[in-house]
From Swiss-Prot:
Protease subunit of a proteasome-like degradation complex believed to be a general protein degrading machinery. Coiled coil: none annotated. CDD domains: protease_HslV (cd01913). This is ATP-dependent protease subunit HslV. The lineage of its organism: Bacteria, Pseudomonadati, Spirochaetota, Spirochaetia, Leptospirales. The active site is at 9. NCBIfam families: ATP_dep_HslV (TIGR03692), PRK05456.1 (NF003964). Belongs to the peptidase T1B family. HslV subfamily. One of its GO terms (cellular component) is HslUV protease complex.
C-alpha cells in the first residue's frame, strides 16, 4: 500500500547584525509523488513587521497563521506574548491539538519556533529551522553564520540550496522575506 503521508518543506530563519531573513522551499509531496513545486510557505504579518513560515499540513498551517495573526493583533504586535498564547491555545484546544504543523515566527527583535505540544523555542544562536530538510539547512546555516560575513538573506539562500540538494522533500523554488 502506498504511503500517503504528506511531507514537505524546509523553513529556515536567520538573524544576524540587526537583520532577519526567513526562507522556505516550494515543494509539497504526498508519499513518493511531488504534488506541487511552487507552494508559498512564508508570509508577512502585522503590516510586514512579522515574518512567518510553516512546515506540515498546509490546511493546518493556514489555520494556525490565522490564529497567530489574531493573537498578534490582540497583543499589539508583541511577538513573544502572541507566540506563547498561540501555543497555549493550540495545546489545550481539542480541535487545534489535531493540527499537524510547526511555525517559525520572527520580527526585528526575536525568533520563535511554535509547536502544538506547547513549545515556544527561541534559538540561542540566530538560526532556527523546521521541516523535512530543516536539519540540513540548519547545519549549513550555522556553518555560514559562524565562518562568513554573509547577510542573513545570503545565508538563507545558500543553506536552502544545500538542503534542496540533500533532502528529496525540498526543492530549489525558494520564497524569501527579510526585515532590515
Amino acid at each position: 500500500m502506498p504511503e500517503n503521508k504528506i511531507r514537505s518543506t524546509t523553513i529556515l530563519c536567520v538573524r544576524k547584525n540587526g537583520k532577519v531573513a526567513i526562507g522556505g522551499d516550494g515543494q509539497v509531496s504526498m508519499g513518493n509523488t511531488v504534488m506541487k513545486n511552487t507552494a508559498k510557505k512564508i508570509r508577512r504579518l502585522y503590516d510586514g513587521k512579522i515574518l512567518s513560515g510553516f512546515a506540515g499540513s498546509a490546511a493546518d498551517a493556514f489555520t494556525l497563521f490565522e490564529l497567530f495573526e489574531k493573537k498578534v493583533q490582540e497583543f499589539g504586535g508583541s511577538l513573544s506574548r502572541s507566540a506563547v498564547e498561540l501555543a497555549r491555545e493550540w495545546r489545550t484546544d481539542r480541535m487545534l491539538r489535531r493540527l499537524e504543523a510547526l511555525l517559525i515566527v520572527a520580527d526585528k527583535e526575536e525568533s520563535f519556533l511554535i509547536s502544538g505540544t506547547g513549545d515556544v523555542i527561541s534559538p540561542d544562536e540566530g538560526v532556527i529551522a523546521i521541516g523535512s530538510g530543516g536539519n540540513y539547512a540548519l547545519a549549513a546555516a550555522r556553518a555560514l553564520y559562524d565562518h562568513t560575513n554573509l547577510s542573513p538573506k545570503e545565508i538563507v539562500e545558500s543553506s536552502m540550496k544545500i538542503a534542496a540538494d540533500i533532502c528529496i522533500y525540498t526543492n530549489n523554488h525558494i520564497t524569501l522575506e527579510e526585515i532590515l
